[in-house]
From Swiss-Prot:
EC number in record: 1.8.4.11
Function: Has an important function as a repair enzyme for proteins that have been inactivated by oxidation. Catalyzes the reversible oxidation-reduction of methionine sulfoxide in proteins to methionine.
Protein name per its UniProtKB record: Peptide methionine sulfoxide reductase MsrA
rRNA-binding as UniProt keyword: no
Keyword terms of this UniProt record: Oxidoreductase
Family of the protein in this entry: Belongs to the MsrA Met sulfoxide reductase family.
Keyword Oxidoreductase belongs to the record: yes
Domain of life: Bacteria
Catalytic activity, as annotated: L-methionyl-[protein] + [thioredoxin]-disulfide + H2O = L-methionyl-(S)-S-oxide-[protein] + [thioredoxin]-dithiol; [thioredoxin]-disulfide + L-methionine + H2O = L-methionine (S)-S-oxide + [thioredoxin]-dithiol
Gene: msrA
Entry-linked NCBIfam families: msrA
Length: 215
């Protein structure tokens, strides 16, 4: 078993439930409205909208890319896929929560398709890098898709195989993206929400491979 001290220093190993930080019962307070479009950040959302969680490295740049997509109703950043309830950003960065930085995407399926969002996801980052994304190193930067229903999961798995074939042609390694049913989602602190709209010159590590997902 990997020691807790090794997780803190190497940042490439996920903790076990026993090693994870305890967290807290109270949820993180977040703004009522999206900084860019003014829509509610939290449920309930209007009927007919669908949701997905995408993790593609640092969530600042990922959220901006996603809120810019036609048909996306609202976005929010947070943490998912780990063990610690209601973690703080510093706790997630320690590697001892097991969470990935993710973007909650709420979209209108009458205006965009899940397949179109998958295309944005695959092409906007490098899904072969394991527990990092570019210069951002740690388990919190791993590539993930957390789906809300069986149809989404099937589409995500099919798109992964399709994109893998294109990556192989370009000489890339195997995709490491985790695709799973949606786990609990915990909102990140208010200052992380729509960070790059509030800080236009802020850090954005988002970068793709140049490989395209076939239609």
């Amino acid at each position: 078993m990997v020691l807790r001290s090794e997780i803190l220093t190497k940042k490439s190993e996920l903790p076990t439930p026993d090693q994870a930080l305890p967290g807290r019962e109270s949820a993180m307070p977040v703004p009522e409205a999206h900084f860019v479009n003014g829509r509610p950040l939290t449920a309930p959302f209007p009927a007919g909208l669908q949701q997905v969680l995408f993790g593609m490295g640092c969530f600042w740049g990922a959220e901006r890319r996603l809120w810019q997509q036609p048909g996306v109703w609202v976005t929010a950043v947070g943490y998912a896929g780990g063990y610690t309830p209601n973690p703080t950003y510093d706790e997630v960065c320690s590697g001892l929560t097991g969470h990935s930085e993710v973007v909650l995407v709420v979209y209108n399926p009458q205006e965009t398709s899940f397949e179109q969002l998958l295309k944005v996801f695959w092409e906007a980052h490098d899904p072969t890098q394991g527990m990092r994304q570019g210069g951002d190193i740690g388990t919190q930067y791993r590539s993930v898709i957390y789906t809300f229903d069986a149809a989404q999961k099937a589409a995500a798995l099919a798109s992964r195989e399709s994109f893998q074939a294109e990556l192989a042609k370009a000489g890339y390694d195997r995709i490491t993206t985790e695709i799973a049913d949606v786990p609990p989602f915990y909102y990140a602190e208010a200052y992380h929400q729509q960070y790059l709209a509030k800080n236009p010159n802020g850090y954005c590590g988002l970068g793709g491979t140049g490989v395209c997902l076939p239609a």
